[in-house]
Amino acid sequence: PFTGGVKVWAGDYSDCKDADIIIITAGASQKPGETRIDLLKKNASIFKDIIERITEVNSHGILLIATNPVDILSYTSWKQSGWPASRVIGSGTLLDSARFRYLIGKNKGIDPRSIHAHIIGEHGDSEVPVWSLANVAGTDLELDEETQQDIFDRTKNAAYEIINAKGATSYAIALALDRIVAAILGNEGSVL
């Protein structure tokens, strides 16, 4: 009752022909102790077929990639599809930035939506926190280096903790993808 009607069905690639946005989440699951980069060979092989099949039926949509390693697979999908770079997008560090803001907010006792802070770079083990620009409504966070490192380590390791606890991540990335789609369809011009 809160989200309206949702229709779910099993289909095939021809169902993508009129899609404005095609979200790809397919791939091998990350196992406990496995890095996102460890998934590259398996998921690159899976993606080769997926991208080929999608581009056979759709040449106008936007590809939104969530499968890890997301940055590399977004790049290879762009190259393989032959589509403009502006139409092949990865989920990037949006989820990392959301986790980062949540942990900062938890530390400061402030709603994470009021925290301005970003994780940049590659999604995963080499991501970078931008502490120099992190603030609450323009006010410095005043976090010591030890607290900053703890928050960043917890941000970076959140997915591994979830994978160890329940085997996979799903809900948070789904919310991140929903946010990206809303920004695209609403032509928001948002920095996510």
Where are these regions (language model features)?
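Conserved N-terminal Rossmann-fold NAD(P) cofactor-binding segment
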Residues: P1-A19
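Short helix-terminating capping/connector loops at secondary-structure junctions
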Residues: F2-V6, V57-S59, P84, D111-P112
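Rossmann-fold NAD(P) dinucleotide-binding segment
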Residues: C16-L63, T76-Q80
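Conserved active-site and cofactor/substrate-binding residues in soluble primary-metabolism enzymes
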Residues: K17, K41-D49, I72, L95, ...
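Rossmann-fold dinucleotide-binding core
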Residues: A26, I62-D140
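Short, solvent-exposed loop/turn segments at secondary-structure junctions
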Residues: K31, I72, I163-A165
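Long, compositionally biased stretches enriched for glycine and/or charged residues
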Residues: G105, G109-L192
